[in-house]
C-alpha cells in the first residue's frame, strides 16, 4: 500500500507556555492545529503579545485547508485574527469555542481594522468529519474551559493525534467530561504520532481541576458576614 507523505511542523508552544500552533501536512494538504499567543517576559517592554511566525504558511497558503481550534483560551486561539490576515482558511471549532472566536474576530473588526471575511464551522465534540478527503475525528477532553476537544487526523500509516490541553478526571460534569472510550477506539485503529501537552508534567501528584473550585467559592460567599 502506498504511504502518505506526512510532515509535522510546530510553529509555537515548544518549550514555552502559550503560543500553541502545529501544522500537519497530509497528502500535500496543510491542517493548522490551534493558533495562540503568549505574553512576553516582564522585561520585554513595549510588547503586548507574541505570536507565531506565519512565513511558511504565507508561502504555502494555497495548500492550507483547515484551521482547527481545540478550545477557547488565548494561548490556542488568540493569534487567529493575525493568522487569517496571512491565510484565510476555513475554521473548525466546537460550539462554545466557535462563539468565543466569533466574538473575538468581531472585536478585531471594530477596533483593529480587521476586514477579513471568515468561514467558521461548528463541530460537535464527538464528530467524525472529512476535510478535503482527509478523515478527521474529534474527541472530548477535560480542561478548565468546557467544550474542549482533541483531534485525530487520519493517514494511511495511522492517526496523528493532537490532545490539546487536558487532564483526566472521571468525575467532571457534562461539558468538561473526557471520552476515554473514543480515545481507545482511535488507539485501536493505529496511531502514527501523538502530540501531547506536557505543562506541569514534572510535578508529582495530581492536578486539581479548576471546575472543582465552585463549591469552595460558594461556601466562602455564603459564610461571609456583612455583605
Predicted feature locations:
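His/Asp/Glu-rich metal-coordinating catalytic cores
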Residues: 1-68, 73-227
